[in-house]
């Protein structure tokens, strides 16, 4: 059966999500999920009908939250579908390319490679910022540039002046996609205000992180209306199931937003607790994180990751040497993880 697959698919290495990697334990801090399991109400009376392509109540609710016009919002099956739509809509297979800056989220390359679009990489600088001269030198045939901020897995914010420089150099050349999956934890760092000046800017958002709805698979693309209309040409006819739209709209209600903001304060306190406890350990470096996770460098990251795994504490190994990414859980999970790591290192 493998030989019947397209050559690009045969050569493809699938993205190994936290769930695919697996593990067994009672502390799961490997997928940047929220520890809060919130309850929602759902009306089962409409399940015999297809959903609307872009449910107005959901679009209007997210537009109000993001402070944009409803015409500037597209909803999809997670931000991952937004990535795929952008590549499919703007890149010609076997002709165009995307560009991204590792270490960063792995689905940019997967989405491109799946449909035969070349991937170009320009690594981040030593302080995990954009290498603008190298990006500019690599823009030939590039139609989409992906930038993640806060970046996954490093946790840092990309300098705003560099984003502006990137937007200027890509005018009339490429779409710039800001992946803001974790921006709810630092909304003041969003680039949404730049949409008014840059028609080639697209912004990815999700309800998976701060809104504690990873299992719902509901994401958004923010852009100017002309770009959104291009994406609407290639999106599936019923991308957002009725239950997803209804629950997401509840999460974006006044009560839902108040709960989300309260829970983010709790997570911020737990992140500070975890960071402070790790920083005092010998040989440990904790990088500043703006999302719901921390990137931590150990004397031997692989051994810490494996020992925690064997102990039922599931963390996320990193492609960065000796680094482990730790999601911020509830206080009990953070205490258990910190205590285990302390015992390993002292």
From Swiss-Prot:
Gene3D superfamilies: Aspartate Aminotransferase, domain 1, Type I PLP-dependent aspartate aminotransferase-like (Major domain). InterPro entries: Aminotrans_II_pyridoxalP_BS, Aminotransferase_I/II_large, HisP_aminotrans, PyrdxlP-dep_Trfase, PyrdxlP-dep_Trfase_major, PyrdxlP-dep_Trfase_small. It comes from the Bacteria. It catalyses: L-histidinol phosphate + 2-oxoglutarate = 3-(imidazol-4-yl)-2-oxopropyl phosphate + L-glutamate. Pathway: Amino-acid biosynthesis; L-histidine biosynthesis; L-histidine from 5-phospho-alpha-D-ribose 1-diphosphate: step 7/9. The keyword Membrane does not apply. CDD domains: AAT_like. Keywords: Amino-acid biosynthesis, Aminotransferase, Histidine biosynthesis, Pyridoxal phosphate, Transferase. The modification N6-(pyridoxal phosphate)lysine is found at residue 209. Its EC number is 2.6.1.9. The keyword Membrane does not apply. HAMAP family: HisC_aminotrans_2. Belongs to the class-II pyridoxal-phosphate-dependent aminotransferase family. Histidinol-phosphate aminotransferase subfamily. This is Histidinol-phosphate aminotransferase. The lineage of its organism: Bacteria, Pseudomonadati, Pseudomonadota, Gammaproteobacteria, Vibrionales. The gene is hisC.
């Amino acid at each position: 059966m493998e030989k019947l697959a397209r050559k690009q698919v045969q050569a493809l290495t699938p993205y190994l999500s936290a769930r695919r990697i697996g593990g067994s334990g009672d502390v799961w801090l490997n997928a940047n999920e929220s520890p809060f399991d919130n309850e929602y109400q759902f009306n089962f009376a409409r399940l015999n009908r297809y959903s609307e392509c872009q449910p107005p109540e959901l679009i209007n609710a997210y537009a109000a939250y993001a402070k944009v016009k409803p015409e500037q919002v597209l909803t999809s099956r997670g931000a991952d579908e937004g990535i795929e739509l952008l590549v499919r809509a703007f890149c010609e297979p076997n002709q165009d390319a995307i560009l991204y800056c590792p270490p960063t989220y792995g689905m940019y390359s997967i989405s491109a490679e799946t449909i035969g679009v070349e991937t170009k990489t320009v690594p981040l600088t030593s302080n995990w910022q954009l290498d603008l001269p190298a990006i500019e030198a690599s823009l030939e045939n590039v139609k989409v540039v992906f930038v993640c901020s806060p970046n996954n897995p490093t946790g840092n914010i990309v300098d705003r002046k560099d984003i502006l420089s990137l937007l200027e150099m890509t005018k009339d050349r490429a779409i710039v996609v800001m992946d803001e999956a974790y921006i709810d934890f630092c909304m003041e760092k969003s680039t949404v205000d730049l949409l008014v000046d840059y028609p080639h800017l697209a912004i990815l958002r999700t309800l998976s992180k701060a809104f504690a709805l990873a299992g719902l698979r509901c994401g958004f693309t923010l852009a100017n209306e002309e770009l959104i209309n291009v994406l609407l040409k290639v999106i599936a006819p019923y991308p957002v199931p009725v239950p997803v739209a209804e629950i997401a709209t509840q999460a974006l209600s006044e009560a839902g937003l108040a709960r989300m903001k309260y829970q983010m304060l709790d997570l911020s306190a737990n992140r500070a607790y975890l960071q402070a406890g790790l920083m005092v350990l010998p040989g440990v470096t904790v990088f500043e994180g703006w999302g719901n996770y921390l990137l931590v460098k150990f004397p031997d990251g692989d051994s810490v990751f494996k020992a925690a795994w064997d102990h039922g504490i599931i963390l996320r190994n990193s492609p960065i040497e000796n680094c482990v990414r730790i999601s911020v859980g509830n206080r009990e999970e953070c205490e258990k993880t910190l205590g285990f790591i302390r015992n390993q290192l002292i």
